[in-house]
């Protein structure tokens, strides 16, 4: 993918643009330079235009190569811009006795020193807060999202952190030369001078830039002259084309030379025509047969389409050309066309490489992990109360002093008491008064500590938490460690101004099966208009990684509930951000509203609304997403309900767990699925199947040898079908087998969650029944908790204890409950295999969110449209005799430590044995299952044989050192769902040690 350049230079097309610097208009045809910033209202970059001189007052480009379109400027303007960029001074060195240049004074303004006005700013060295009244130092930068949009962003530093980073920040002078130094107190001035002494000139880094001027060798001098001559000839033609030729004649000239005219951009059309007259006609693209090439940096890029989803973007440095042929009638009309040469020539370009930071930003934007963490540059020990929240009850005369002491120790003072308050500073007298705030503190279990607590912490900076317990003066208090806020790690996405303050998922009010978008403000007085088979509500999407687009567009025709009044509501923007806008239009009649709705649909998709069932994707247009909004009132909270459940407590807790809406939402968020545009359960099963097919297609492309154009095409389709939240980062190209496996697992989870959601939707909330009992009835599975004192429980516990592998020691497994499982119809389905020899009780693990689907439909084999990745022995149902091997598939963590596992009776019969991966499409006639033999296994001589002949391989593990196998542990695979009879469900607690 092409590097996204931060600036754009061109000649003003009209005289209407206003300079963002001086606020005056920019005259037509004068050179103007733009900062390309993200629009707050559309999923696109927009130019903030400046006069040339105003631009350099507001921005500090590091390289002329960061300026898009510079190669299409006049030679003199290229030269001037290069000189201006080169003259920007980025470092401040000691200039004793020297007259300071304008560039030096401009650079000096980017630095400053002062006392922190609050405790809100963050040091960009150590990423810790800078407390109020501490000395802080500023470097204003211009290459950040904020800096580019607002003409600079001040980045603050502690004095010690700035001193360590001074070289890369570009400050080599003494600290006393920094603006603001004189405003500091004498002792702070001394600290600054000591921390930031001047650096000798001979120790300065080489800051010279590569200049545009070439060295004086004959060859390079000739190249420079050729560049100038070509540029002059090019602009002679361009000026004549712009000032003299009619557009229809330009089109005739281009088409006569088999060049497809650029549409929608007159200036690019002039560029294309001038290039034709100066250098000759470019041959058609070998990839897509397009006849339209656009100048791009130091070459030409094909403007054709690989498919309706993807641009071709083939890049040519030196395209094959033929001589430009001018029709006689045009020569007669335009005299300058008689000067066109009859021999094609090669266009040479100046090499303007982008700055390293531009490369870096581009690499970060294309990083496969869009949550790349921002790590501190400077290690710094956190103050003892860092990020801990304190409050005060009473002690009114000492509030100001106590607040300052808390903040000096790194803590935060908050008037409001909350569950995140670590402790409250007060007195025994205030405890006896039992004020409302004190009672609330007792309810939350927050410790009350005296003022002396701060004395202890100031004397012993490592014992803050222990002093909360030891100095506590109240009779209550939960573990203070539980109230320590988790360290928040910043990511590239969270740093963006367009991903902060994102709205939480909203409740949709459903009327007649259709939801009114709450952003319309009409959800209480209107409903979605329905006309025969037409439901006038659509959600459109488009992901295009070549243009960094991840857009949505929603349109609804709404009718007032009580009168003849109609509205068209539409909203649009970038998925996962606050970029976007909306519009509400009122109509008097349904016909005018329908006409407007259909016009919008046709404009955005290129399809007529009446033909939506035969939808054809159009190049650059949007695609409908099948999202079905249902009544969110059915997503009840299980904590309290009017009707008492008839289920055992352990079964109630299990049903709560597997039907937990928050867990399902968290799972979708882990996969970066956009929860605003695609709330839980709203994506159709058909759309999920389509996504499976796209992922399988990507797998086939990789198997046949990676083809970037095909991968981009399929990636665009996948992310359009399944909206993902990439924030402002570039959507990730799907190009590895690991990504395919991750997406397959995501779609598996989506499919299972869709089952759970369908069950919830089908329930009648008006029933005089607890929702847990409703859920339980819907899964059609009997669950009975085993007595923990029974022999059956003891045998199964031994199976867990003995088969935990030595390579899986990051956690221990604690059994919370074991349930005997009887799925409706499964025993009957399994009956033919009950007579088969070699039946074992084996483990299977899966995500929590998959268990509604598993219990209601049984364990299933991946659908045909799913890619074959992740299946070592083909698509089947996988089991293990080592508990921890299956436990790893529960996808638990220290934060989400509850997992569910199954023990199933598996009819293995005659097994095809393998010691390495072998993809099996179909077993041979005399085999019933596949056995991947691992080197470590439960001791087969110690197995327990049940009365019905089923083997429980619960022996202690042994290792066969002589076996040549690539597998660590045994795997068992069956390819017929009828060979599985689920018998037990374990609720496990994963006790992580690290």
From Swiss-Prot:
Give any Gene Ontology cellular component. Answer: site of DNA damage
Gene name, Swiss-Prot/TrEMBL: Parp
Its biological purpose is as follows:
Poly-ADP-ribosyltransferase that mediates poly-ADP-ribosylation of proteins and plays a key role in DNA repair. Mediates glutamate, aspartate or serine ADP-ribosylation of proteins: the ADP-D-ribosyl group of NAD(+) is transferred to the acceptor carboxyl group of target residues and further ADP-ribosyl groups are transferred to the 2'-position of the terminal adenosine moiety, building up a polymer with an average chain length of 20-30 units. Mainly mediates glutamate and aspartate ADP-ribosylation of target proteins in absence of CG1218/HPF1.
Instruction: Look at the named UniProt entry and state the broad enzyme category this protein falls under.
Output: transferase
Q: Which UniProt keywords apply?
A: ADP-ribosylation, Chromatin regulator, Chromosome, DNA-binding, Glycosyltransferase, Metal-binding, NAD, Nucleotidyltransferase, Nucleus, Repeat, Transferase, Zinc, Zinc-finger
Q: Which GO terms describe its biological process?
A: Cajal body organization; chromatin organization; DNA damage response; dorsal/ventral axis specification, ovarian follicular epithelium; double-strand break repair; heat shock-mediated polytene chromosome puffing; maintenance of protein location in nucleus; nucleolus organization
Family recorded in the similarity comment: Belongs to the ARTD/PARP family.
Compartments where found: Nucleus; Chromosome; Nucleus, Nucleolus
MF terms from GO for this chain are: DNA binding; histone binding; NAD binding; NAD+ poly-ADP-ribosyltransferase activity; NAD+-protein mono-ADP-ribosyltransferase activity; NAD+-protein-aspartate ADP-ribosyltransferase activity; NAD+-protein-glutamate ADP-ribosyltransferase activity; NAD+-protein-serine ADP-ribosyltransferase activity
Query: Which residue ranges does the record assign to the WGR domain?
Result: 525-622
Annotated organism of origin: Drosophila melanogaster (Fruit fly)
Residues annotated for Zn(2+) 3 binding in this entry: 285, 288, 302, 312
Tell me the protein's name.
Poly [ADP-ribose] polymerase
**Segments of skewed composition (Basic and acidic residues):** 200-225
Q: What InterPro entries does the record tag this protein with?
A: ARTD/PARP, BRCT_dom, BRCT_dom_sf, PADR1_C_dom_sf, PARP, PARP1-like_PADR1_N, PARP1-like_PADR1_Zn_ribbon, Poly(ADP-ribose)pol_cat_dom
Residue ranges for the region (Automodification domain) are 368-507
List residues binding Zn(2+) 2.
123, 126, 158, 161
Per the annotation, the residue ranges of the short sequence motif Nuclear localization signal are 208-210, 223-228
Q: Which residues form the active site?
A: 971
**SMART domains in the record:** BRCT, PADR1, WGR, zf-PARP
This entry's Enzyme Commission designation comes to: 2.4.2.30, 2.4.2.-
- Domain named BRCT: which ranges? 380-471
Per UniProt, the PARP-type Zn-finger stretches lie at: 7-89, 111-200
Chain sites annotated for binding Zn(2+) 1: 19, 22, 51, 54
PARP alpha-helical domain location, by residue? Answer: 644-761
